[in-house]
């Protein structure tokens, strides 16, 4: 975990700039008076990809925001962007956002007009531009109850369809043939996570997610428990995937490919 950008350091730092060997006609200088720093410059690239795909804006339409909009800070797309960009940067755990909420570069990537959080309405939140772990946890665990702690219910079926359509629209409309690859990959766990099961094939505890690709394009990623075989739940997934591909590529021949774990009559029928 990196040190929060606002954290003070007891180390005596050099204040004078350091000069390095010139790079052609350019001078290379190290200056320690740069102000707010971040080690996550890749967040800006993630934002550009998000803008091109319209990911967070589209996903935001799968949620219902019951919060009082007059007092809302941050907005729903900003919450989604913070969580998704954090995952893309390698911060999988929500408690990572205890420090990430202080990162001005991540705040700028999440479209915050005040990346330092100096103008926030609540004085207790000033200097903290982004949300903490508890807010993001409520977003992830939101349900269909409009209670004090659950103000952002989501529609799982709508999210599923949204992500599928985003993948399918990358396929060429006039494709002659579309090869759909099925894969089940063991995801081992190292604790007592909810839903973990022992899988004899992997000789360990974990999950058995289902992945569906067309070439390098991901169409489906479904978390499943490991107490079933690779083919479990594939038929309902394929029905949705094939229908979406058929709507996009009307003249294409669709082939479904998988290893022996998917050699089941219900899939081949």
Label every PLM stretch briefly.
Residues 183, 252-262:
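Acidic/histidine-rich, metal-coordinating catalytic segments
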Residues 1-229, 235-250:
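Dynamic "connector" segments at or just before major functional cores
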Residues 262, 266-269:
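Gly/Pro-rich turn-and-neighbor structural signature
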